[in-house]
Amino acid sequence: MIRHLIYSSQKRAIWFSLLVFVGLLFTLGCEANANIEDSSTVIPTVQSSAANVTVTSTLVPSPTVNRTSSCIPDGEFNSDTDYFPDKANVNYANGFSLEYHNSFKILTINATDSTADQSFVLVQCGAPIPDTIFPTITIPIESVFLSSTTQYPSFIELGSVAKIKGIGQAAFISSKEIIDHVKTNEVVEFAANFEVGTEVVIESNPDVLMSNGFSDPAYTKLAQLNIPVINWMDWQETSALGRAEWMLVTSSLLNQELTSRVFINTIAKNYEEITEIAAQARSDVVALAGSAFQGTFYAPGGASYVANLLKDANIEYVWSQTPDTGSLYLDLESVIAEGVTADIWINAPTQWTTIEEGLSEDPRYGELESVKQSNVWTHTLLVNEQGADDYFERAASRPDLLLADLVKIAHPDLMNEHKFEWYQQLPNK
């Protein structure tokens, strides 16, 4: 009986202790939760150099997509929030890089033989401007001046043609959408005579000016006046896919990385599939490429994107062993000597409409085997009424179609269903 009472007392004591322990845990848990709730409403203050930015003091859900047409609302900025959930990796291009931070990106245009490194801080609208020595650009941009025709396609693809407020030369535009935009809106032509009109640019004060990549004192002057001038160096890429990837420079300014990433991935997939088809060719084809202007024959260097396009098309290029990424400057005697046995000639002078016309310009072209076999090609299939060639506008952004054209020229049996996009064979007369 005593043993039973002792056992019962011990049992009650144990249960009582357990109840006290559980109650203590519950109390501590409630206090911890209360502390967590308190901390969630207090976000560290972010020092801002922008007077119109207010730091939030309440928890705001993180964005699931980039802001392509709006700013961070006043009072909702949070330094811990990633405002760029849609990012882009640079997989093919060598000429630029993108670095992402929570509320800003760093766009770097790499140095070339003629230009220095450039870095720009792209700050999400509504976010504070970070302390930096680099020029800052508020994104998404609302206005842009474009110097090169290869810059147009990305704005078309990203649905942002309306942001184009200035163009270099209207005469070189081939896209109907851009032509219509220029005609119906107050779009400034700022380099009609191949000279940048700085006063016109300054008056318009665009968010960004994209240069043509060539050195010009006018660009330096504009940059000194706080108009960001981005060097557009796509033409120095060594691969066609690398050149197409310059679309990411545009999309980073528009916060449209998601759209550009899908577009580029699709093109890259197409390109790889066409390369695999070209590899099945059973015959060796040698190509001469380039054209003469004022006594000098300009040919793609052996490390250029054109030379690598020919390689991917399973075409042997006459000057493939040269290390140049740009153009070769040759005399016609060298061209005849080295290219005399080439099977095809691509990128022949665009002003020629017949082979006969070319021979009248210089009879020595008649020594070339490609001329004898009437296998001379120009990229003039899509030239509009004002003489603008779509090849110089859209081909850089669609290397898959460009590669398909080249494969069809050299290995027509492998691309029966492909219709030429830019190239056409010159008739004899």
Give the predicted meaning of each segment:
Residues 186, 197-199, 203-296, 320-321, ...:
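Extracytoplasmic substrate-binding proteins
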Residues 11-22:
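Sec-dependent N-terminal signal peptides
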Residues 276-362:
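Flexible, glycine-rich surface segments
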Residues 326-341, 345-413:
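C-terminal soluble interaction/assembly domains
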Residues 26-29:
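C-terminal motif of bacterial Sec signal peptides marking the signal peptidase cleavage site
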Residues 31-152, 259-288, 355, 409, ...:
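Bacterial Sec-exported substrate-binding components of ABC uptake systems
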Residues 105-204, 208-213:
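A short, structured surface patch at a secondary-structure boundary
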Residues 1-11:
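N-terminal secretory signal peptides that target proteins for export/translocation
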